[in-house]
Amino acid sequence: MPRYKLTIEYDGTPYAGWQIQADQQTVQGALAQAFKRFCGEDVHVAGAGRTDAGVHATGQVAHVDLSRHWRSDTVRDAMTAQLRPHPIAVLSAEEVPDSFDARFSATKRHYLYRIINRRPDLALDRDRAWRIPQKLDAQAMHEAAQRLLGKHDFSTFRAAECQAASPLKTLDQLDVSRSGDEIRVITSARSFLHHQVRSMVGSLMRVGEGRWSADDLEAALKAADRTRCGPMAPAAGLYLAAVSY
């Protein structure tokens, strides 16, 4: 059966996450239904990242096995038509070897977190960013973030329901930058614990508002204790930006 790699963009606001759940609207479920309408097949759409409810993607990657060969642009365009009116877009489709697995072949996942640092409410980015009214020091956040790079026990930044076998992860990138009112947090690793990115962002917010120092952040990491984490950032600001292979 030919295998296709899909690069997908979506607004996660109306979905209960990526993974199919009974009686709930999910991104994976919407894609499977669209394939059913396109080619009449019941397929499993395997994603690189199982994003939570309300989390977005600009570069999610998935693979799917179909019973016959289709031109890649036909798959892309047919899915575009069948997905309407869902806020999901298949940006590209390409045939790949059977050995390709969207989840297990990935060498790095890249996430973006958007903070809008202003007092007025968000009109256009209400469900696409975290509004923080108090002034944040993005440079202090960036400098503190470097303390989290490398291989560590990230239990402090791990959800209680996380099913990962080990809390050990290697964080390759965690950059914080400001452009006007927007603060962007960009992070990369082979894989992340459940809620790790949102937990790190919430803790960095404590640094930005001056309540924590870089030493405080590092101490929270080394404690390997969930109760030492800052507030978890809301899902609305998080994007799965890209996946490397």
Curated annotation (Swiss-Prot):
The organism of origin for this protein: Xanthobacter autotrophicus (strain ATCC BAA-1158 / Py2)
Function description: Formation of pseudouridine at positions 38, 39 and 40 in the anticodon stem and loop of transfer RNAs.
HAMAP family for the chain: TruA (MF_00171)
Active site per UniProt: D52
Documented EC number(s): 5.4.99.12
Name of the protein in question: tRNA pseudouridine synthase A
CDD domains: PseudoU_synth_EcTruA (cd02570)
InterPro entries: PsdUridine_synth_cat_dom_sf (IPR020103), PsdUridine_synth_TruA (IPR001406), PsdUridine_synth_TruA_a/b_dom (IPR020097), PsdUridine_synth_TruA_C (IPR020095), TruA/RsuA/RluB/E/F_N (IPR020094)
GO molecular function terms noted in the UniProt entry: RNA binding; tRNA pseudouridine(38-40) synthase activity
